[in-house]
């Protein structure tokens, strides 16, 4: 399980160094194999260990290619999916087209989200967090049943 937000830097080749606390888990559970794709709702990337991505692919394969909305989701997620292998120094190379989608240049937020990471440009991440907090403060109590049952 991945949690927390960590500032990491991309090097000049577009590689990010995976924080040490995740490396062993990624090596053990995925042999360091990851899949990166775009987030279709936000200007960030989604980074999955290969076994987790294979579950997503199975779900995508069950969508109808005859349904325009389902086909669009398949096209966006699978069409942008890029395999990346963690090297001996714990780095992952993020494809240029993916970095461009999320506006990633130097400082990147690696955000744990249970079974995957989100990769955000640092400035965009802080803006998104502010927007999310502001939206919650303005919310009128329209919580789903699942959120109502969540006790923090």
Swiss-Prot record:
Domain SpoVT-AbrB residue range list: 5-52, 81-124
BP term (GO), one: negative regulation of DNA-templated transcription initiation
Record carries keyword Cell inner membrane: no
Protein localization: Cytoplasm, Nucleoid
Keywords from the UniProt entry: Cytoplasm, DNA-binding, Repeat, Repressor, Transcription, Transcription regulation
GO MF terms, alphabetically ordered: DNA-binding transcription factor activity; transcription cis-regulatory region binding
A GO cellular-component term linked to this record: nucleoid
PROSITE patterns associated with the record: SPOVT_ABRB
InterPro entries tied to this protein: MraZ (IPR003444), MraZ_C (IPR035644), MraZ_dom (IPR020603), MraZ_N (IPR035642), MraZ_sf (IPR038619), SpoVT-AbrB_dom (IPR007159), SpoVT-AbrB_sf (IPR037914)
Main localization category: cytoplasm
Keyword rRNA-binding: no
Subunit structure: Forms oligomers.
NCBIfam families the record matches: division/cell wall cluster transcriptional repressor MraZ
PANTHER family in UniProt: TRANSCRIPTIONAL REGULATOR MRAZ (PTHR34701:SF1)
Family per record: Belongs to the MraZ family.
Chain's role: Negatively regulates its own expression and that of the subsequent genes in the proximal part of the division and cell wall (dcw) gene cluster. Acts by binding directly to DNA. May also regulate the expression of genes outside the dcw cluster.
Protein name, as recorded: Transcriptional regulator MraZ
Lineage, broadest ranks: Bacteria, Pseudomonadati, Pseudomonadota, Gammaproteobacteria, Enterobacterales
């Amino acid at each position: 399980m991945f949690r927390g937000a960590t500032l990491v830097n991309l090097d000049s080749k577009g590689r990010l160094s995976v924080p040490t606390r995740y490396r062993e888990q990624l090596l053990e559970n995925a042999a360091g194999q990851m899949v990166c794709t775009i987030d279709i709702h936000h200007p960030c990337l989604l980074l999955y260990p290969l076994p987790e991505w294979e579950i997503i692919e199975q779900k995508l394969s069950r969508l109808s290619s005859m349904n325009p909305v389902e086909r669009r989701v398949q096209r966006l997620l699978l069409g942008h999916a890029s395999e990346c292998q963690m090297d001996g120094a714990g780095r992952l190379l993020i494809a240029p087209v993916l970095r461009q989608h999320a506006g990633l240049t130097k400082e990147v937020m690696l955000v744990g989200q249970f079974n995957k990471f989100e990769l955000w440009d640092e400035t965009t991440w802080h803006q998104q967090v502010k927007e999310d907090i502001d939206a919650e403060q303005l919310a009128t109590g329209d919580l789903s049943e699942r959120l109502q049952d969540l006790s923090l």
